[in-house]
C-alpha cells in the first residue's frame, strides 16, 4: 500500500505532534517523509528468503520463569512516593493542563 504524502497528511501529523509549522517547514517534512517511505519501499523489494537472521531482538536465553508473587499493598506502593494525594500517586502535569 502506497501512502500519499500530501498537505492533508502533514497537517494531521502537525496536529498529532502539537507543533506549528510554517510553509517552508511543511514542504521540507513532506519531502523527508517521501524519501523515508521510498527508502522503505526499496528495502521491502529485496529478496531475503535465503538470508539467515543475524540478530534476534529478544534473547531467549535470558528469560526468567514466570512465578506468581505477592503484589504490593497500597501502603507499600505509596511508601516511597514523593507526591501522593488521597491514596494516589501524583505525577507531573502534562501538556495543555
Swiss-Prot record:
By its UniProt entry, which SUPFAM superfamilies does this protein fall under? Answer: Glu-tRNAGln amidotransferase C subunit (SSF141000)
UniProt enzyme class: ligase
**Keyword rRNA processing among record annotations:** no
The positions making up the signal sequence are none
Q: What UniProt keywords apply to this chain's record, in alphabetical order?
A: ATP-binding, Ligase, Nucleotide-binding, Protein biosynthesis
Question: What EC number is given for this enzyme?
Answer: 6.3.5.-
Name the Pfam families for this protein.
GatC
Q: Which InterPro entries match?
A: Asp/Glu-ADT_sf_sub_c (IPR036113), GatC (IPR003837)
Q: Which positions are tagged coiled coil?
A: none
Please give one Gene Ontology molecular function term for this protein.
ATP binding
Reaction catalysis annotation = L-glutamyl-tRNA(Gln) + L-glutamine + ATP + H2O = L-glutaminyl-tRNA(Gln) + L-glutamate + ADP + phosphate + H(+); L-aspartyl-tRNA(Asn) + L-glutamine + ATP + H2O = L-asparaginyl-tRNA(Asn) + L-glutamate + ADP + phosphate + 2 H(+)
Domain of life of the organism encoding this protein: Archaea
What's one GO BP annotation on this UniProt entry?
Answer: glutaminyl-tRNAGln biosynthesis via transamidation
What does the record note on quaternary structure? Heterotrimer of A, B and C subunits.
Protein family according to the UniProt entry: Belongs to the GatC family.
The free-text function statement in the UniProt record for this protein reads: Allows the formation of correctly charged Asn-tRNA(Asn) or Gln-tRNA(Gln) through the transamidation of misacylated Asp-tRNA(Asn) or Glu-tRNA(Gln) in organisms which lack either or both of asparaginyl-tRNA or glutaminyl-tRNA synthetases. The reaction takes place in the presence of glutamine and ATP through an activated phospho-Asp-tRNA(Asn) or phospho-Glu-tRNA(Gln).
Q: Which PANTHER family match?
A: GLUTAMYL-TRNA(GLN) AMIDOTRANSFERASE SUBUNIT C, MITOCHONDRIAL
Protein's UniProt name: Glutamyl-tRNA(Gln) amidotransferase subunit C
